[in-house]
């Protein structure tokens, strides 16, 4: 047992433990930056979206079924992760840059939020050129709600998104729930269906604007004849 008295034995042991810990940390960091641990989104059916209850944000709110948003002319809808998030404000501004083209197509632009805290929606409105509604039951964030917790802060893609939005001049706050991931939908008129469904996979994972515009061009507005069918 003389080797136990050899200082080099303990030094080598500590180096081995340290190397093992570093290797495990490196592997964890590597896996955290892949999609291995990301929850897979469950696609929403049109019938699921149609039945969602939304509320207007007036002093006397009106509750209505979400299908009213797209029944006649289709719609582009942003499910906002958190109005105070500067990444969400960046995406809202990006979508709003399509507003004039969407207007030419006759397709409205909307957003839904999952909570209405103090002036958060009011402060978000300058970034978004469309009406905003409240989805209290968070249905637009389902059918299977997905969360990104603190793992998001060790993902390189998230940090890239942070710097991109920051360099773009966007700022925000930490008010409200921000772990349930959002998304963007392009829904056709009537029973045309969901033409685009983008589910945020990490903080700041923005929808492709060209894809939104291409999907919006596929919308076929309801006519009196089609409404009677």
From Swiss-Prot:
Segments of this protein annotated with the region Thioredoxin fold: 14-112
Active-site residues from the entry: 85 (redox-active), 88 (redox-active)
Induction: Up-regulated by CSF1 in peripheral blood mononuclear cells (PBMCs). This induction is reduced in the presence of TNFSF11.
Keywords annotated in UniProt: Antioxidant, Cytoplasm, Redox-active center, Secreted
Transmembrane spans: none
Family matches, as CDD domains: PRX_like2 (cd02970)
GO cellular component, one term: extracellular region
Residues in coiled coil: none
Keyword Cell inner membrane carried by entry: no
InterPro entries associated with the record: PXL2A/B/C
GO biological process: regulation of osteoclast differentiation
Expression sites (tissue/organ): Expressed in CSF1 and TNFSF11-stimulated CD14(+) peripheral blood mononuclear cells (PBMCs).
Subcellular location(s) of the protein: Cytoplasm; Secreted
Its job: Involved in redox regulation of the cell. Acts as an antioxidant. Inhibits TNFSF11-induced NFKB1 and JUN activation and osteoclast differentiation. May affect bone resorption and help to maintain bone mass. Acts as a negative regulator of macrophage-mediated inflammation by inhibiting macrophage production of inflammatory cytokines, probably through suppression of the MAPK signaling pathway.
The family this protein is said to belong to: Belongs to the peroxiredoxin-like PRXL2 family. PRXL2A subfamily.
More details: The active site cysteines correspond to the redox-active cysteines of peroxiredoxins.
PANTHER family registered for this protein in UniProt: PEROXIREDOXIN-LIKE 2A (PTHR28630:SF31), PTHR28630
Protein name per Swiss-Prot or TrEMBL: Peroxiredoxin-like 2A
Source species of the chain: Homo sapiens (Human)
Lineage: Eukaryota, Metazoa, Chordata, Craniata, Vertebrata
């Amino acid at each position: 047992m003389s080797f136990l008295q050899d200082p080099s034995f303990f030094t080598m042991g500590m180096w081995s433990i340290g190397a093992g810990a570093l290797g495990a940390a490196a592997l964890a960091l590597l896996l955290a930056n892949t999609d291995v641990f990301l929850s897979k989104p469950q696609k929403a059916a049109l019938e699921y979206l149609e039945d969602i209850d939304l509320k207007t944000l007036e002093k006397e709110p009106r509750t209505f079924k979400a299908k009213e948003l797209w029944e006649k002319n289709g719609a582009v809808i942003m499910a906002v992760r958190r109005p105070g998030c500067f990444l969400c404000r960046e995406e809202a501004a990006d979508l709003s840059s399509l507003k004039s083209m969407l207007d030419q197509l006759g397709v409205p632009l909307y957003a839904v939020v999952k909570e209405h805290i103090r002036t958060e929606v009011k402060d978000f409105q300058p970034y978004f050129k469309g009406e905003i509604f409240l989805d209290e039951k968070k249905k637009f964030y389902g059918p299977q709600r997905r969360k990104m917790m603190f793992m998001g802060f060790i993902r390189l893609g998230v940090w890239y998104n942070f710097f991109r939005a920051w360099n773009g001049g966007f700022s925000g706050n930490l008010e409200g729930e921000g772990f349930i991931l959002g998304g963007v939908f392009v829904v056709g008129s009537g029973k045309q269906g969901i033409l685009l469904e983008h589910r945020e996979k990490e903080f700041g994972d923005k929808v492709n604007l060209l894809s939104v515009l291409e999907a919006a061009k596929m919308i076929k507005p309801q006519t009196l004849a089609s409404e009677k069918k």
